[in-house]
Amino acid sequence: MAESRTSADGGMETSYGFREVADGEKQGLVNEVFHKVAKRYDIMNDVMSMGLHRAWKDAMISALNPRKDPSYKVLDVAGGTGDIAFRIVEASNRLAHATVLDINGSMLGVGAERAAKKKLTDNLTFVEANAEELPFEPNSFDAYTIAFGIRNVPRIDVALKEAYRVLKRGGRLLVLEFSEVDLPLLDRVYEAWSFNAIPQFGKAITGDAEPYQYLVESIRKFPNQQDFATMIREAGFSRVNFTNYTGGIAALHSGWKL
């Protein structure tokens, strides 16, 4: 579970991959990972998901079914490169507005460049901020999305409570994340791929295997589907459920602020 715990000396610790680090240290370590991979982030997702992340993201947008309405506002957290936000805007016939929030300026820079090339800048706002301290008023958004980002947040419970706070009544939370594989044979194959192939592919692509090693380890430390659903309920959300993709390699969690 990626939650804060009390260390032997009384300080607060959390997981950074398979390591335990001080609560205040994790964010800096995660930031460094994403500074290194920002320009190759989509390639990274292809490597980590064997290309399946594209289908999973399409399914996420279908589940969201964004309104074709200029008043419809979505907050996409940890969405720096814009992949989810672009899909949301396009699915709304370029009518909805998406705020892309990320704590990493390098990721946001990539997203802003891509948005300009796609001529989507009128539908997007890019904000550099922390998921645990959202710079928005309560009841500001119709939907909150986060894809492959929640496991990198030091205090997931705090981020979920912030999501609840900024959503309007009737607003929806959607979290797409790598999860616990529920088919034993697939689990063995995916584990071998994750711990052997992914870091080596990462080194070949970026010249550095370490960021990919962390990302693989962070998947294993993330709560399983049922435990994460419980965390979402504890943050205040109703009608919480999840859908497994590809045998549980990824899962889409949904909750509503009612």
Curated annotation (Swiss-Prot):
Its EC number is 2.1.1.163, 2.1.1.201. It catalyses: a 2-demethylmenaquinol + S-adenosyl-L-methionine = a menaquinol + S-adenosyl-L-homocysteine + H(+); a 2-methoxy-6-(all-trans-polyprenyl)benzene-1,4-diol + S-adenosyl-L-methionine = a 5-methoxy-2-methyl-3-(all-trans-polyprenyl)benzene-1,4-diol + S-adenosyl-L-homocysteine + H(+). The keyword S-adenosyl-L-methionine applies. Keywords: Menaquinone biosynthesis, Methyltransferase, S-adenosyl-L-methionine, Transferase, Ubiquinone biosynthesis. Pathway: Quinol/quinone metabolism; menaquinone biosynthesis; menaquinol from 1,4-dihydroxy-2-naphthoate: step 2/2; Cofactor biosynthesis; ubiquinone biosynthesis. GO terms for biological process: aerobic respiration; menaquinone biosynthetic process; methylation. It holds the Pfam family Ubie_methyltran. The keyword Methyltransferase applies. Belongs to the class I-like SAM-binding methyltransferase superfamily. MenG/UbiE family. Methyltransferase required for the conversion of demethylmenaquinol (DMKH2) to menaquinol (MKH2) and the conversion of 2-polyprenyl-6-methoxy-1,4-benzoquinol (DDMQH2) to 2-polyprenyl-3-methyl-6-methoxy-1,4-benzoquinol (DMQH2). This is Ubiquinone/menaquinone biosynthesis C-methyltransferase UbiE. It comes from Rhizobium rhizogenes (strain K84 / ATCC BAA-868). The gene is ubiE.
